[in-house]
Curated annotation (Swiss-Prot):
This is Argininosuccinate synthase. Pfam families: Arginosuc_syn_C, Arginosuc_synth. It is found in: Cytoplasm. Belongs to the argininosuccinate synthase family. Type 1 subfamily. It comes from Methanospirillum hungatei JF-1 (strain ATCC 27890 / DSM 864 / NBRC 100397 / JF-1). L-citrulline binds at Y87, S92, N123, R127, S173, S182, E258, Y270. PANTHER family: ARGININOSUCCINATE SYNTHASE. Pathway: Amino-acid biosynthesis; L-arginine biosynthesis; L-arginine from L-ornithine and carbamoyl phosphate: step 2/3.
């Protein structure tokens, strides 16, 4: 007697495709239900996953999670200036949303287990596991559990008639969603290897970008981008539009050595044109409307938020507390930021906000609004403790 139904998070790639027969042959499940999530990747990718899921699995679901991804993950990331080790997160933000959708299908299908095709070296295994286990479901990860090699996987796929297009000359792995596109593997694993231009799909080379700059005007309400050049747009549409424009100017490439959750260093290459522009504009607007103390403290909160997001710890109570603080600060992050896009760079040209407490009368060198002699007394005691210690050290 078999083990019933298992629901598999499915991308249509090599790893998740071979999991379908493996879950039956090696794990003894009667039914394998696949779930492909649309989080803004290319439509061709979704179509391939749907076609293969319907062909090889007992049942297949394709779920449109784009709006959910935008509202639950991307907009909060903008409000938190979501950068991990200096780059905009994308994959890490999408995984929990996908995992939660898989859990819902597992409940619907009365499944006894859920599965994913993650390896034992990456971060995604942990992001899926934490959501799956929170739902009290058995978690199966065939690739991780059986320590498979790429060569073995290809052979197994061929044996089961699973078409897997793998180019040995270009064996890099690509993951994309509405916010970012990551490229890794193959020759790219050598940190000294110069990546060929052909790996990029969202951005033109800054060297070949237009010789004329383009200016965008981005309007924010409560920290969320709501309009582009004065035209209000739905979140997903605004992100797509900004991404297409910015990518055409060579903006959003990042080639870096990344510290994974397990401590492994990995060479990762990213494209995130919309993220670069929107995060730059948002951070600049915060400098206009937040107080010095708010701004300084929020930087530490943003860093912790990014770490928890990268680690996939969205059920950590601290996550809710950080989001509550961030939401409070964003009430005044309203206004418009003008940015110039030119050959790979994003430059803020100007910003305005009805919630700004900036006063040109106070800040101007030509203003007499503030009596400068008032600062004399303050200056006398500024750094007092440091001066006293310095004097003692000189004795």
């Amino acid at each position: 007697m078999g083990k019933g139904t298992v629901v598999l998070a499915y991308s249509g790639g090599l790893d998740t495709s071979i999991c379908i027969p493996l879950l039956k042959e090696e794990y003894g499940y009667d039914r394998v239900v696949t779930v492909a999530a649309d989080v803004g990747q290319r439509k061709e990718e979704i179509s391939i996953a749907e076609e293969k899921g319907k062909r090889f699995a007992d049942k297949h679901y394709t779920l449109d999670l784009i709006d959910q991804f935008v509202d639950r993950c991307l907009m909060p990331s903008i409000k938190a200036n979501g950068l991990y080790e200096g780059y905009p997160m994308g994959t890490s933000l999408a995984r929990p949303v996908i995992a939660e959708a898989v859990v819902e299908i597992a409940k619907k299908e009365d499944a006894t287990a859920v599965a994913h095709g993650c390896t034992g070296k990456g971060n995604d295994q942990l992001r899926f596991d934490v959501v799956f286990r929170a739902a009290d479901l058995e978690v199966i990860a065939p690739i991780r559990e059986r320590n498979m090699t790429r060569e073995w996987e290809i052979g197994y796929a061929e044996k089961h008639g699973i078409p897997v297009p793998v180019d040995k000359e270009k064996p890099w792995s690509v993951d994309e969603n509405l916010w970012s596109r990551s490229i890794e593997g193959g020759k790219l694993e050598d940190p000294a290897f110069h990546p060929p231009e052909e790996i990029y799909a969202w951005t033109v080379s800054p060297l070949k970008a237009p010789d004329e700059p383009q200016v965008l005007s981005i309007t924010f309400e409560a920290g969320i981008p709501v309009a582009l050049d004065g035209k209000r747009m739905k979140g997903a549409d605004l992100i797509r539009t900004v991404g297409q424009i910015a990518g055409g100017h060579g903006i959003g490439r990042n080639d870096m050595m990344e510290n994974r959750v397990l401590g492994i260093k990995a060479r990762e290459i990213y494209e995130h044109p919309a993220a670069n522009v929107l995060l730059t504009a948002h951070a600049d607007l915060e400098r206009l409307v937040l107080t010095r103390e708010e701004y300084a403290f929020k930087q530490s909160v943003d860093a912790k938020w990014a770490q928890l997001a990268y680690y996939g710890l969205i059920y950590e109570p601290l996550w809710d507390a950080l989001n509550a603080f961030i939401d409070t600060t964003q009430k005044r992050v309203n206004g418009t930021v003008d940015v110039r896009l030119f050959k790979g760079s994003v430059t803020v040209l100007g910003r305005s906000s009805p919630d700004s407490f900036y006063s040109i009368d106070v800040a101007s060198f030509d203003s007499t609004t503030i009596d400068q002699t008032d600062a004399i007394g303050y200056s006398m005691y500024y750094g007092l403790q440091a001066r006293l210690v310095r004097k003692k050290q000189k004795k």
